[in-house]
Amino acid sequence: MNSIPIYQVDAFSENLFSGNPAAICVIKEWLSDETMQSIALENNLSETAFVNISLKPFYIRWFTPESEMGLCGHATLASARILFDEYIDKNSSEIIFQANRGRLRAIKKGDLIYLDFPKDFPNPIANNEKIIDALRLKPKKLFKGIDDYLAILDTEEDVKNVELNFEKISELDARGLIISANGVNT
């Protein structure tokens, strides 16, 4: 295997050792899924992004140390920073990424980078016992998006006081569980 440039970027911060770290691997041809998974495991960061710069738009994939992810915001932001700084024309102000889920745009304005992600419109679903077990209460409304469940509780106070069962959350058929409620001032 040829050498692969790997960058570690702390997204959302200008200070060293702060922010949200991600590894960025810039490649010109795809590696096997097993190799990318092994690299992510060795990097041991929450996400490692693989950006294939030989494809237009640039194709991007994200791996945790355990598995491939469908989408990762901070690793996309970090990837855009590396590409703007090191790989594309300095006058460019936009990068289009192609991901398994669709296209993502990174727009550079001055020193800032803005991301435009595909929309996710969660659909209402019936309550189910797994969610109730994870929340230890019955949500007022429940929705399922592409990656996550969204549980709407009765009150803001319920959100503050919920005692989650993280073991049950890890058993859900989703990346995560988002909890919300109408606030007092809404």
PLM feature spans:
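Active-site proximal loop and beta-alpha junction motif in alpha/beta enzyme cores
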Residues: 1-71, 77-186
